[in-house]
Structures are given as structure tokens and as C-alpha cells.
A protein has these predicted regions:
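Generic structural signal for small/hydrophobic residues in well-ordered secondary structure
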Residues: 9-10, 46, 79, 104
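A general structural signal for well-ordered alpha-helical segments in protein cores
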Residues: 23-24, 43, 56-59, 76-79, ...
Length: 129
């Protein structure tokens, strides 16, 4: 696993691909330091939002050389447990985001996201700009 790895969430990658300064600057720094980690879920979310063919090429270029975490059956089970635990506290996260949070927790990674609901996940390290 990448030392000091950072899972860069879909919300940030979308802004990066659009060239929005805050995301572009930080993601570029993380890429140059070889700290970016992603997951199949995040890749699927990016691909789902493609509007033009050239965007697919940009995503492929971005992801080349980036470590990709796989979501195993035990991780899905843990994501379900976390989702259930959060719901009992009145917090509902999309299951995809719960799985991303568990990936970060299980791999001792930081999550770079613009989605505020991740702050509700206990012990999740959020990347600070």
C-alpha cells in the first residue's frame, strides 16, 4: 500500500477534471507525490458521468499508474455494518460512499472529498486543504 496514501473521492476528481483550481492544485500535488489511491467504485462513478468521448481518455490518463483498491466480500459486509450503525444514529450515507469510507478505514488511508456527510463516519481521516 502507498505510504500516506489518499483516496481521492469522485467529487474531487470531477472538479479536478473540470480544472477547478482548488481540486486541480491539490490533486496535482498528490499525483506528483504518488499518494493518490482510487477504487473501482470511484472509477465507475466517474465513467457514469462521462458526457463526451474525450472525457474517457482524460479519465484513463488520470488513472494510469494510480493504485486501485478492490472491494472484497468482507469489505462489503463491513460497509453494510457501518451503514446500519450510522442509520441507527440517524445518519444515512449512500452505500457507495460507505464502502469508500470502509476502504479508507481498513487501509489506514485519508479520504479527500468535498462531500460533507463523510464527517459523520467515526475515525475516518479527512484530507485537509
Amino acid at each position: 500500500m502507498i505510504k500516506d496514501g489518499v483516496i481521492v473521492d469522485t467529487s474531487v476528481l470531477i472538479d479536478f477534471l473540470k480544472g477547478i483550481a482548488k481540486a486541480a492544485t491539490e490533486v496535482t500535488k498528490l499525483l506528483q507525490a504518488n499518494r493518490v489511491v482510487t477504487a473501482g467504485i470511484i472509477i465507475a462513478e466517474l465513467m457514469q458521468g462521462i458526457g463526451r468521448v474525450d472525457e474517457e481518455d482524460r479519465i484513463a490518463e488520470l488513472l494510469s499508474g494510480v493504485s486501485v483498491l478492490e472491494v472484497s466480500t468482507p469489505l462489503w459486509i463491513e460497509a453494510g455494518r457501518l451503514s446500519s450503525s450510522l442509520r441507527r444514529k440517524g445518519v444515512t450515507l449512500p452505500l457507495t460512499d460507505t464502502a469508500i469510507a470502509v476502504l479508507a478505514l481498513e487501509n489506514n488511508l485519508t479520504l479527500y472529498t468535498f462531500d460533507k456527510h463523510f464527517a459523520q463516519v467515526p475515525n475516518l481521516k479527512i484530507y485537509k486543504v
